[in-house]
A protein has these predicted regions:
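Conserved donor NDP-sugar-binding/catalytic core segment of glycosyltransferases
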Residues: 104-135
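Non-catalytic, C-terminal membrane-associated alpha-helical segments of glycosyltransferases
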Residues: 223-230, 241-294
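Short, well-formed alpha-helical segments that are part of the catalytic scaffolds
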Residues: 20-33
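Acidic donor-binding loop at a coil-to-helix junction in glycosyltransferase catalytic cores
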Residues: 183-192
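Short aromatic/hydrophobic "clamp" motif used to bind/position activated sugar donors
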Residues: 92
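A conserved acidic beta->alpha catalytic loop
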Residues: 30, 46-55, 99
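Short, flexible, basic/aromatic active-site loop/helix in glycosyltransferases
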Residues: 124-125, 138-157
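Glycine-rich, basic loop-to-helix element that forms the pyrophosphate-binding segment
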Residues: 71-87
Length: 294
């Protein structure tokens, strides 16, 4: 298996975007602040946004290797697959447009990949932006999931493409990595495929990506109700494959109690627990109804 080095091109950072130009600007700016990073390119796939990439995005092409691709609206899975086809790096790194890399993220990820030739996929450490209630609730969610789904061998039963990497050799470049059928929860469907293949991502705890949700609390609630059915359809696909990935009711209770304890920290606060519980409700209700309805 190839070892990551500083030559040739190491990382292809692939970002799908749909009208999220301002958050994307912060994301690509964070890549200019990387310290001791190996060589990388950035591929931004515009999934049919209402407006083409603004000038302040196009200007980044003069700072590092940035490729802008525009396609008709086909969904995030198709956008990422298009980015894969255009990529040249030994490792593909996926990140959401509303995320920011910590300064040593790529250097840490490269070092971990070099030391882990037995692993093909890597889950980066995701954190929230605790400057507002939406971000504190997201931090609480991420802390809980990453703590409870971490395995004794350092792998994690969790995959979130807000910060995920995979070796190029593991990917069918022409076919792509993501199933376009999954309009939502495409990363969970990918996790199911990895589990079927006997693999889990290695958790890279020191390669940190901040997920800075740009929506207001009301906008988040509206989105949660809107996408709950889409998430459930992907979970149906996973269930049809016979892959069990969801936690048991007992595990869910332990996670709720753990969240309550974590919410006692001053940096998060109890209100974040209630916000998170409310945001999870639409998805859980839809899943329950699909289970009990003939």
């Amino acid at each position: 298996m190839a070892t990551v080095s500083t030559s040739p091109l190491v990382f292809s950072v692939i970002i799908g975007v749909y009208d999220d130009w301002i958050p994307l600007d912060r994301c690509v700016r964070s890549l200019t602040q990387q310290t001791n990073a190996p060589s990388f390119e950035v591929i931004v796939v515009d999934d049919g946004s209402g407006d083409v990439a603004p000038e302040y995005i196009r200007n980044w092409t003069g700072v590092y290797q940035l490729t802008l691709i525009r396609q008709s609206h086909a969904g995030i899975s198709a956008a990422r697959n298009r980015g894969i086809q255009a990529s040249r790096g030994l490792v593909l790194v996926f990140v959401d447009a509303d995320c920011k890399f910590h300064p040593d993220c790529l250097a840490t990820l490269a070092a971990t990949i070099n030391k882990s030739p037995q692993h093909n996929s890597f889950q980066l450490h995701l954190v929230g932006d605790c400057s507002g209630i939406v971000g504190r609730a997201e931090e609480l969610r991420l802390v809980t999931l990453q703590n409870h789904l971490l395995q004794p061998d350092g792998c994690i039963r969790y995959l979130n493409t807000a910060g995920f990497a995979i070796r190029r050799a593991r990917v069918d470049i022409e076919k792509g990595l993501f199933d376009p059928v999954a309009v939502r929860a495409e990363d969970t469907l990918l996790l199911a495929s990895l589990i079927q293949g006997g693999e889990l991502p290695l958790f890279v705890s020191k390669a940190i990506v901040q997920h800075a949700i740009p929506l207001s609390l009301l906008e988040c609630f509206r989105k949660d109700f809107r996408v709950a059915q889409l998430d459930a359809r992907t979970y149906d696909i996973i269930a049809a494959r016979g892959v069990r990935f969801r936690v048991s009711q007992q595990q869910r209770l332990r996670m709720l109690l753990s969240m309550w304890k974590t919410a006692g920290q001053d940096s998060i606060g109890r209100l974040a627990w209630f916000v998170l519980a409310a945001r999870q409700a639409p998805r859980l209700i839809v899943l329950f109804l699909r289970k009990v309805t003939p």
